[in-house]
Amino acid sequence: MAKLAEQQIHRLTIEGYASGGSGVARLEGMVVFVQGGIRGEVCDVRLTHVGRTALWGRVHEVITPSPARVVPDCPHYGRCGGCQFRHMDYAQELEAKHTRVYDALTRLGGVEHLDLPPVLGSPKVDRYRNKAQFPVSRGPRIGFYQNRTHRVVDVPDCLLQSQAAGRLRQAVKEWMTAWSVPAYDEKSRLGLVRHLYVRTNRRGEALATLVTAT
């Protein structure tokens, strides 16, 4: 078989989930972390990174879909690294999180004979986060880092964040544009604004903090 390399496509079966929400498959004895995979699916996976002991990839095409697969309701999903589960239904998301905890306690923590109860679901599956940390880059782009990178994906509205956080994000973007306030650049180490940090409460009140280079 040819040497494993980035951009190759391999047909794999998703066996489980990793701690970051990616599906887990195996190829030539190596673990493959598959972005967008659901347990039980057969997928054509495009390799995005080849490491010495593990591989990373993303779903190129789903050959045998899981009944839990849904169409993501966020237009930025797949590029934005802010969440990992919008391609599966909520019941499967809870199973994936249960697997994460079980593996951490048994495989990493060494706990034996663990009877772990199911994850309790929330009645509120959107707009439940009360803290947002938005990285800022040239443009300005204000949103979240693309998966496994420091490239900022401009996200006007995150379905997991409060609407107040989204309005503050837009206000800061307009202020930076109107006053030519520069975003911080990690490579040149020039610029000013690095992050926008927002906390909200149940009354709809919000606290915004700008993290700057100086």
Task: Name each model feature, range by range.
Residues 1-214:
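Accessory RNA-recognition modules of RNA-modification enzymes
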